[in-house]
Structures are given as C-alpha cells and as structure tokens.
Regions:
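Substrate-binding groove/exosite segments of carbohydrate-active enzymes
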Residues: 487-507, 546-669, 709-711, 721-723, ...
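Beta-sandwich interaction modules
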Residues: 60-61, 119-128, 243-276
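The feature captures the catalytic groove of carbohydrate-active enzymes
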Residues: 500-534, 584-586, 634-650, 683-758
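Extracellular carbohydrate-recognition regions
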Residues: 1-23, 156-174
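Terminal accessory carbohydrate-recognition/targeting modules of carbohydrate-active enzymes
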Residues: 275-276, 281-557
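Disordered, acidic Ser/Thr/Pro-rich linker "stalks" and the adjacent N-terminal cap
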Residues: 30-34, 41, 158-212, 218-228, ...
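Hydrophobic/aromatic beta-strand segments within beta-rich folds
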Residues: 69-71, 113, 133-141, 168, ...
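Extracellular ligand-binding interfaces
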Residues: 44-124, 145-151, 156, 216-244
Length: 803
C-alpha cells in the first residue's frame, strides 16, 4: 500500500525501490539528516556505463494549483543529471523537475521545487498540471556516469498563497458594485465604474508576490467591443503592461501570462462603457506554459464544437493529400479539417443557421476512400439540417502544384443555411507531434478578405465562386467561431492579431429543399498555381493511375481490400517523398531514416516502381563517411550523426533488395565501393566487442555484438546493446555476400558469409544468456534492459526471416 505521510517520506529505505538500467547499481540506506532528523541515502555506481538509476516510492497526496515542494539535499559525485518526478495515481503520467549536469551540494542545502518547475513530461494526459500524486521518483541519469551518493531529508509541501490577503481598489464605482465584489462571490455582479469616470481603472493587491500563468475574466455584460490594458507591478508604483486588448468581445476573456509573478494587477479601460468586471480567476502556470497548452486550457471553457478535437486532448487521425511527385502535401483529418501545407493553417467547415452553427461535433461523420485504394479520401457529414462532402486533392506539377478542397452541401430544410469555411490558426497535426514548427498552433498574424480570396499572412486562399459574406476576427473576439455561434459572420475584412491567433471565413448561401451547392477553394503551394479546371479532380486521378501502374494482381474477392490497401500505402510513399528522399511521414517524419526508406523502397520495387529505391540509394550514398559509417537519418538540414548501428546493415540490405527486384547489375556495381566500405565498418564495430575483456563473465553477454546505440527512441537517453542492430547487421553481411556473388567477387562473398554466420552465433548466444539470467519467457530487445520489444522481434522474424 502506498504511504500517505509526505513528512515521513524519507524515513524508511524499505518503502523505496531502486530501478537501475544496464550495468548500473544502486542501494538505499538511512542517513542522518540536518538537525539529527532521519534521511535517505542513495549510493549509485554506473560501473563504467551509461543509463539511469531510479529511486521510487509509492505515496499518495494531493497538490494545490500553486505549491512549493521543499526538501533538503546533499551529495557527492560527478555532475550527472538529476530528476525529481511526480507520478499520478494511474502510474502513466509524469511531471519532471530536471537539473542537467547537477553538482550535488556537499553540505545540506534546501531545494525548492515549485509547480512551475514541474512541467508535464509524458503520459496519455498529454499535458496539464499534476493534482493527485501516486508516486515520487528520484532519478540520476548518467552524464559522465561514475559513482556517488545523494541524500535527502525534511520534505514538506507548502501553499504560498495561504497567507495572502487580497484587496481591490478602483478609480470609481456605482452603487452596490464595489471593487472588492470582483474577488468575492457577490450577488451584486462585480465592479462597475461610474458613468462619468474619464479614466476608469480597477486594481488588485494580492498581499504579496503571486505566481500565475493567466487570467480568466468574466464580464458583466456583452459589450460589443472592449479596449483595455492589463498592467502589473511589484510595489504599486511602477507599472508595466502585461497585456493589451483592442477588440475584446464576448462574456469571457482568457489572457495568457506564462511565468508571470506580481503583487499588483491593474486594468485600465479605454472608456467607461466597458469598464466593469464580474469576476477574475487567476490560473496557475500550466494554464499557458506553452502556446499550445493555453489553447488546451481555453478549449475546456467552451462548447466542444468550438475547437478541433485534439484541443480536447483527443486523437483525431489524419491522412496525407498530395501528388505522385511528393515535395509538398496537405493533411485531412477524420472530421474534415484540411491543413494546407507543412506547419500551415487549416480550413475547417461549418454550417450556419439563423442563430447558431453546426460543426464536426454535431454531425455523423463518415470517412471514405475509392474502392481501388487511390489516394483521394473524402469526408461526409450527415446532420438534421444538411449533408456535406469534403473532398481535397492536389494537382499540378512543379511550381504549379496546388491544394484544392471541394465542399458540396445539400440543404435539406426549407430554411436559409450557409456554408462557412474558416481559416483557423491550427494545424491538423496535433501538439503531441510537436517538432520545431510542426504540431498544434500555426500562427496567423494578419488576414485580408474579399469575396474571392483571403490573404493569410503571405499565403492565399481563393474561391472559384464568390462568397456571399466574408470577414476576419482576432482571438480576443473569440475568433470567427464566436460569431458563428450566433449565426453571424464577422464584419471586419482586415485584421492583425499580435497573438498570432487570427481567423477568417468565407460563407455561401445553400439553397433550401435539397438542392446542392458546391465550391472549390485553392491554396497554391507555390506562386504559379492556377485556378482549377472543371475536370481538375478527374485529371489528378488519371495522373495517379498512370504514375502508379501497379502489377495486375489477380486475387479472389476476399483479398481485394488488401490490394487496395497496398495501393494506398504505395501512394503515401510517393506523396511523402522529397525528391529522391523517401520519408515515412508527411510532417513529424519528414526525415529519411535509412531503416524506413529501404523497407519502403523495397516495397515500391516489388510494386513495379524500382526507380524509387534506386534514386534513394544514389542520393543517400553521398552521405556515407569515408570510413564506411552509414548515417541513420538525413533531412533538409543535413546528416544527423546520432549513432544507430542498425543503419549499416540496412544500407547493405537495401542495395541487395534493389538488385533482387530490378536485376540492374550495372547499378549495383556502381555502389560496390560503398558496399565494401560499409562491411568494413560493420566488422570494425563488432571487433570492439571481441577483445579478451569481453570474454570475462561480467561482459560475456556482449561478446561479438555491435556496440551500444540509440537504435530507437526508447534507448535515446541511454544507448544499449540492441539486438535490433545485431539482426540487421547479420542480414546486412548476408546481403553483402549475395551482392559479391552477383558481381563476381567470390572471395569477399565467402568471407562475408563466414562473418555473418559467426555474428549470428554470437547474437543467439547472448540472447540465450540474457533469457536464462533474467528468467525471461520472451526474446529480449537489448542485453542491458532485457526489455520486451515485440517490434524488434517481429522485424527479425517477419522482415529479416530469422525464424
């Protein structure tokens, strides 16, 4: 059972558990804390390796929104990385305080961990702040490694806001609407300035410095537009502007103030017509710790239909939209939202009635793909009012490449409806796929609208049918959706939004009683794109049919879906390419991992498209080092020199697969120097684990393996001897021998087959040793962790034929 007394947290080592990785070891004992109090000591030794050591205690307690976790710490040893983590009761979500290259204090020192020092680390919650704790973890992660000790004592949890007494003052007030009413649950409805106040303001004194991450303001009435400055001060004398609003509207406003702390806040209003506040809720740092977290927080305050699904921390799946030449591509998600370019804004449809809106959250949604698997997905909405079909595609070539989206609405009522397509500052790609600019928010700072097009920063959205209404809105107006919710369109046609959260829309009347209306929007990828021809979609489909002329597989009806799925997958491989670079995805994975690329290239070769793999190998070979090292990944920025030792075997396997499928001896011969160089480097790596000290019992399980590497994300923080690398290495040597045979290099072929056979024997011996030593009933993924890695095992058996 987890302990419930935080104050006694460090009293008993038996209530803690040590979890080491690899060769590392750790032990827990009692220690004498400051003032003679009991403490906990962790002694650790990485024994010359990398990895981590975790000390974990299950303990239950709750947290306030703002807190200080205070503990005493001392230690000695190298400057490794120190982590203090809070785990929720599910055990799945973690918040982490991290000190890299932390020099442990030799004497007892107080360490204060604030709520803003514990950002969300990982887990299905996707973000937010911790509220209930189920376990504490203290982690030492090897930097230089080595050995040392760290001791802890005197842990406490404090709420620094408890002693703060808030009070408010204002420039004026009307009867029964005093300044302090904003801070209370007052029936009077908050504070209101006097009607003759020429410069109204309202201010709060928190009674001390308060940490906060934002404000949620409820206004007393729905004034058309509010303008005000929010100012902060530490002493009530010197003020700085924290936020400025010029067109705020609606009954509630959300203001992000990441990392803010202040004693005083003051609202200065532009006029007394809008000078009133019903209530203010101060929000903690997690409210706006990142721009994406801020939108997550805002979405919880509005109806579900106002924001795309992922802002409610729900996964919305998506598929790429592109052409056979790759290069640029859009995304379509399950709800019909279309991202117009990499890290770009999105087009989102709405149906407007006289008084409200219909969105993805109100519709029965169905996803479709042509029966033959061609890459033309489309979405249908069914509602009580109307049916809507959303069909995106890409046409053109080179600099004329353009994204098209056709919307077809059928109004099934006798009433007036409008189809509105909004430009929103959100990607289809969710924030948990964040990488650089990818994922979550796509900032929009300025928009200009006309009946025919919207200029969104430097990008254009044009319509083949003039809109009946158009307009733009800033975030402080709740965006265009704030108007849609009232069945309206915004009236401003040109805006700038310093927050980068501008939105806009075009709307068209949908004829009543079942008649259909359709409109096509165009978003050029480059400057030379033209308006779509009437048969644009049919031409794009014909282009795909010609380009992806797959073999005429004869299969029974039960297997036709499998062939269609293969066609879709092959199409996606082409869509996601960037010139010769084969990339496993359209956004986060726009990088060429040798692993993914040769497997996908081999699939395309089997599908009658051998040039895809051949072009890739020609391009990738340029990045091989002179010593034969094959990089694991290359992207637009160049080579990533991260060590993943599966890359060398994959490179050799890919060249051999190309020869098997297209029989091009001349091409294989042109890469022979690269083949020999990769084999030499592969054997050089293996030789590092064949020295006498690796025959000693403590290291014998590593004998003959490839050295440690970060062959997948799970090993990034602490590289290990990965059997995934080894299986690829064995198969790479076998592939090299096959190439040598085909090219007439018999001595090389014989030698490399021997190398492969001996390598495989050492790998199997190591696996058997780990299984016996750790008492496993599965094939481990690595020597150090003995981890269950079904992907690696399936790859060895299925892809590489080690059965």
């Amino acid at each position: 059972m987890p302990s419930s007394s935080l104050a006694d947290c460090f009293n008993d080592p038996a209530t803690w558990r040590v979890i080491p990785s690899g060769l590392a070891v750790g032990t827990l004992t009692s220690a004498k804390g400051p003032d003679g109090k009991i403490g906990l000591q962790l002694d650790y030794d990485f024994r010359g390796g990398a990895g981590f050591i975790v000390a974990r205690k299950e303990i239950e307690f709750n947290l306030t929104e703002i807190f200080d976790l205070i503990l005493s710490i001392r230690g000695e040893g190298p400057q490794n990385h120190f982590e203090f983590k809070l785990i929720d009761p599910s055990g799945s979500n973690a918040w982490r305080y991290l000190r890299e290259r932390f020099q442990m204090p030799a004497d007892w020192t107080q360490l204060k961990v604030r709520e803003r020092d514990l950002p969300f680390a990982w887990g299905p919650a996707g973000g937010g702040a911790p509220s209930a704790v189920g376990a504490i973890e203290i982690v030492i992660v090897a930097g230089p490694g080595g050995k040392g000790s760290v001791s802890f004592s005197n842990i406490s949890l404090e709420d620094p806001t408890l002693h703060l007494t808030r009070s408010a003052v204002a420039s004026s007030q009307i009867s029964n609407h005093p300044p302090n009413a904003v801070l209370e649950s007052s029936p009077s409805g908050g504070w209101q300035a006097a009607p003759n106040d020429p410069a109204p303001w309202w201010s709060v004194d928190f009674g001390g410095i308060l940490r906060f991450g934002g404000l949620v303001i409820d206004w007393p009435s729905s004034v058309a537009s509010r303008a005000y400055d929010l100012e902060q001060s530490a002493d009530g004398a010197a003020w700085t502007t924290l936020h400025r609003a010029t067109h705020a509207s609606g009954s509630r406003s959300h203001i992000p103030t990441p990392g803010a702390e202040s004693r005083f806040l003051r609202f200065k209003f532009a006029s007394n017509e809008c000078a009133g506040i019903r209530s203010i809720t101060m929000r903690p740092d997690a409210f706006s710790s990142t721009p994406d977290e801020f939108i997550h927080s805002v979405a919880t305050d509005f109806p579900r239909s106002w924001f795309p699904r992922y802002w409610h921390r729900e996964q919305s799946y998506w598929t790429p939209i592109g052409s056979p030449e790759g290069t640029r591509r859009g995304l379509l998600n399950e709800e019909g939202m279309v991202e117009v370019d990499e890290a770009g804004f999105s087009l989102e449809p709405f149906i407007l009635t006289k008084s409200t809106m219909i969105s993805w959250a109100d519709a029965k949604i169905t996803r479709h793909l042509p029966a033959n698997g061609a890459p033309f997905p489309f979405i249908t909405w069914e509602t009580d009012h109307a049916a809507l079909i959303i069909q995106p595609w890409v046409d053109g070539t080179g600099n004329s490449l353009a994204l098209r989206v056709n919307y077809r609405i059928e109004n099934r009522t006798p009433d007036a409806l409008r189809l509105a397509v909004a430009v929103r500052p959100f990607q289809v790609n969710p924030p948990w796929q964040k990488f650089g600019k990818l994922g979550g928010i796509s900032p929009i700072h300025s928009i200009t609208c006309t009946a025919d097009e919207m200029r969104v920063d430097q990008k254009y959205v044009s319509s083949n049918h003039p809109a009946d209404a158009w307009g733009a809105a800033a975030f402080e107006e709740n965006g265009v959706v704030g108007f849609f919710a009232r069945g309206q369109m915004p009236s401003r046609t040109q805006i700038t939004d310093p927050a980068g959260l501008a939105s806009a829309a075009m709307a068209w009347s949908a004829p009543p009683n079942g008649d259909a209306f359709e409109v096509t929007l165009t978003v050029p990828f480059f400057d030379e794109a033209k308006e779509p021809l009437p048969n644009s979609l049919a031409n794009a489909a014909a282009h795909w049919q010609t380009t992806l002329a797959l073999p005429d597989w004869q299969v029974p009806a039960i297997a036709r879906d499998a062939i269609a799925s293969f066609r879709s997958a092959a199409s996606h491989i082409l869509i996601n390419r960037d010139g010769p670079a084969i990339q496993p995805g359209p956004r986060r994975y726009t990088r060429s991992w040798i692993r993914d690329s040769v497997i996908m290239g081999a699939a395309m070769a089997k599908a009658g498209q051998p040039h895809v793999l051949r072009d890739f190998l020609t391009w990738y070979t340029e990045f091989q080092r002179d010593d034969g090292f094959v990089p694991c990944v290359v992207d637009r920025t160049g080579v990533d020199w991260l060590v993943e030792h599966d890359s060398h075997g994959q490179f050799l396997w890919g060249i051999c697969e190309n020869l098997r499928n297209d029989g091009d001896i001349e091409f294989a011969s042109s890469l022979w120097k690269s083949v020999r160089s990769a084999v030499t480097y592969l054997n050089h790596l293996r030789a590092q684990r064949m020295t006498p000290n690796y025959r000693e019992p403590a290291r014998s399980a590593c004998y003959g393996l490839l050295p440690e590497s970060a062959s997948h994300e799970g090993y990034l923080a602490h590289p290990v001897h990965s059997y995934w690398d080894d299986f690829w290495g064995v198969r790479g040597l076998e592939a090299a021998a096959e190439l040598a045979d085909a090219l007439g290099h018999q001595e090389d072929a014989q030698r490399w087959r021997t190398d492969a056979r001996e390598f495989l024997q050492d790998v199997l011996k190591s696996i058997r040793h780990v299984i016996a030593d750790r008492k496993l009933n599965y094939i481990p993924g690595s020597m150090e962790w003995a981890d269950f890695d079904p992907t690696a095992t399936a790859n060895a058996i299925g892809q590489l034929d080690f059965a």
